């Protein structure tokens, strides 16, 4: 079993990264939280979770052990697979998810794509004893102006995650136009994931 991989980032897109180590390129599926942590660096260390089945062998990469632990907790819940767990971790920070589970906020989980009422309740029931928040989520770094590059990058990220271009453009444009205060690309994508 693999615990972590350390190497040079060869390719980085919002849902995956290719890391070269020992002349081998490893493709790892990642959350948007991990993606944003990797955007400004050339080499990294990611913690790994392996999914090995008859028809597939997938590697999931996480920026820290806490994110990996939450992922493993999420996929232990009936009805939550690796893709839904990754979508949850892309929509919420680790601190936000811990706080939602700990406080029993079913409606916050239901607002996420792929999570219905029963699944949200099940996540909270199954994980409430396993998850204890470290602290209250802190606000993200604010970017002074929303530029067209940020809008384009947000749309590209959503398309890469499997959403249609037209739906992605509509949602991102709506978020940007309704937001009189400045915001980050991460905040735009998280809001969009809740609306799609």
Curated annotation (Swiss-Prot):
Presence of the UniProt keyword DNA-binding in the record: yes
Start and end residues of each stretch annotated as Domain III: 146-196
Entry keyword Ribosomal protein: no
Keywords: Cytoplasm, DNA damage, DNA recombination, DNA repair, DNA-binding
Compartments, record wording: Cytoplasm
Main subcellular location: cytoplasm
GO cellular component: cytoplasm; Holliday junction helicase complex; Holliday junction resolvase complex
Region feature Domain I, mapped onto this chain: 1-63
Similarity annotation: Belongs to the RuvA family.
Assembly and binders: Homotetramer. Forms an RuvA(8)-RuvB(12)-Holliday junction (HJ) complex. HJ DNA is sandwiched between 2 RuvA tetramers; dsDNA enters through RuvA and exits via RuvB. An RuvB hexamer assembles on each DNA strand where it exits the tetramer. Each RuvB hexamer is contacted by two RuvA subunits (via domain III) on 2 adjacent RuvB subunits; this complex drives branch migration. In the full resolvosome a probable DNA-RuvA(4)-RuvB(12)-RuvC(2) complex forms which resolves the HJ.
Domain notes: Has three domains with a flexible linker between the domains II and III and assumes an 'L' shape. Domain III is highly mobile and contacts RuvB.
Designated name of the protein: Holliday junction branch migration complex subunit RuvA
Organism of derivation: Azobacteroides pseudotrichonymphae genomovar. CFP2
Gene name of this polypeptide: ruvA
């Amino acid at each position: 079993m693999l615990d972590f991989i350390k190497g040079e980032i060869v390719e980085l897109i919002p849902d995956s990264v290719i890391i070269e180590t020992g002349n081998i390129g490893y493709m790892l599926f990642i959350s948007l939280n991990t993606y944003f942590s990797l955007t400004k660096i050339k080499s990294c260390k990611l913690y790994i979770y392996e999914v090995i089945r008859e028809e597939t062998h997938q590697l999931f990469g996480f920026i820290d052990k806490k994110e990996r632990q939450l992922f493993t907790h999420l996929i232990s819940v009936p009805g939550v697979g690796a893709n839904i767990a990754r979508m949850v971790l892309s929509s919420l920070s680790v601190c936000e998810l811990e706080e939602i589970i700990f406080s029993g906020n079913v409606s916050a989980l239901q607002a996420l794509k792929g999570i219905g009422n029963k699944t949200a309740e099940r996540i909270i029931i199954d994980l409430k004893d396993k998850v204890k928040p470290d602290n209250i989520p802190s606000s993200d770094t604010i970017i002074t102006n929303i530029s067209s590059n940020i809008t384009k990058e947000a749309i590209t990220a959503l398309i890469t995650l499997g959403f249609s271009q037209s739906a992605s453009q509509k949602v991102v444009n709506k978020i940007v136009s309704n937001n009189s205060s400045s915001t980050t690309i991460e905040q735009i994508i998280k809001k969009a994931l809740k609306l799609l």
